[in-house]
Amino acid sequence: MRVLTLNAGSSSLKAAVFEIQSVPQSGGAPCGQVWTADSRGDAGLVGDLLAPVLPDGIDLEYKTSPPIEVVGHRIVHGGTQLSDAVRITPSILDEIARVSEHAPAHNALALDVIRRTIALFGDDVPHVAVFDTAFHRTLEPAAFTYAGPLDWVADGIRRFGFHGINHEYVSGRAIALRDRPAESSRIVTCHLGSGCSLAAVHDGRSVDTTMGFTPMDGLPMARRSGAVDPGILLHLLRRGSHTIDSLDQVLNEQSGLAGLSGTTGDMRVVLDGMDAGDPRCRLAFDVFAHHVRKGIAAMAASMGGLDILVFTGGVGEHIPRVRSAICASLGFLGVAISPDRNLSAAGESELSDASSAAGVFVIPAEENWMIAQACVRVVSSSVR
C-alpha cells in the first residue's frame, strides 16, 4: 500500500511516502519510505507550505504510477470524541474544526491541508486523521481530571496530553531496544523540541503526561510558558495591563526560553549566549533543565519507578549538553549516562553506562512512520 503522510505543525509541513506491504508490528523500526520533503513558513500561507511538499510533479510520480492509495494527516487535538485514528468524513472534519480553538496554531493549518489535498487527490483516495491526543486516552480519571468544579469534565475540560504519536513510537522502540516486555516496563519519554512534553508509559500505556487541556501546559518550551500559576493571569487581567488576546500572545509566543533569554528561543542560541556569559541565557537554561528534571521525577512517581528514559525531539536528539544537565541529578532514579556515549550519540543510541539501573536512550522522532502505520490499519480494517 502506498501511503502519503502529511505532518502539519504550527509553521511547518513534513511529508513522506511509504510503501507498506502488510500491517506493521508495534515497536518496529521505520521501513518502506520512498520519498520525503518538508517546508517552513508563515502558518497562514498554507499554499506556500504545500508548494515545496506537494509540487505539480507529485501527480506524475506518486499519484499515477503507482498511485497514492491513502493520505494520512497528523491532527494535534482530537478532543473527547476523536480518540483513535479514523477515516476522514465531513462529520470528522466538523469535529476537528470544533476543537480547533484549543490548538488553533495547529488544527487550523491541518484542516486547510486536508481540504487542499482532498481537492488534489479526489474522493476516491481515503484520508485518515491520526491524533496526537489519542495515545493519552488511557489516562485514568485521577490523572486527567483538574481539581476545579466537577462539571468541567462534562464540559470537556480535562487533561488531554499531546505529542502522543511520538511518545507512542519512542516508547515502543525503547522496549524493543531494551529487549524487555512492555508489561514490565516503566518508561519516561521526553519529547524536547520547540514544544516540550513528558509522558509516563507503563505496560505500554500512557498513564501520565505534562501537557494538559492545551499544548500550552507543562514544561517551559521555546516560546510557550508551560505551566504558570493561574493567579498570575488573574492578577494581570485585573491590573488592566493585558487583555485575554494579549495574554494569549504572551503565553504562546513571548515566554519560555525566548521570554527568559531575550532570544528566539532556539536552545542552541541560548547555549551560545550562556557560554558568552549572558545571565538571562543562563537563567533560561537552568529553569528549563530544572522543570524537565522535576517532571521526569513526577512521571516516574506515577509508575512507582523508572526502567527506561528516552530523549526525542529536536533538542532531545541533538543537544548533548541538555541531556547531560537533565540526567546529572537523576541518580536517585537509577539514571547514569556515559559522557562519551552522550557526546557521540547519533540516531538510535543508548546513553546509559554499566552502572545505570535504568536504560537511557536517544530515539529520533518518526511521526510520519506512525501516521503511515495507522493509515494501513484503518484502511485494512475497513475492507474486511
Task: Give residue ranges: language-model regions.
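Glycine-rich phosphate-binding loop of actin/hexokinase-like ATP-binding domains
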Residues: 137-237
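Structural signal for terminal/edge beta-strands and the immediately following C-terminal loop/tail
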Residues: 348-384
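Glycine-rich phosphate-binding loops at beta-strand->alpha-helix junctions
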Residues: 307-329
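Short beta-strand-loop/turn "lid" adjacent to the catalytic site in phosphate-handling enzymes
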Residues: 59-108, 126-128, 133-146
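A mobile "lid/hinge" subdomain adjacent to the ATP/sugar-phosphate binding pocket shared
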Residues: 239-286
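Short glycine-aspartate micro-motif
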Residues: 3-5, 70-72, 128, 187-191
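Short glycine-rich, Thr/Ser-proximal phosphate-binding strand/loop in the N-terminal lobe
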Residues: 3-44, 212
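Phosphate/ATP-binding catalytic cores across multiple sugar-kinase/actin-like superfamilies
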Residues: 170-173, 177, 286-304
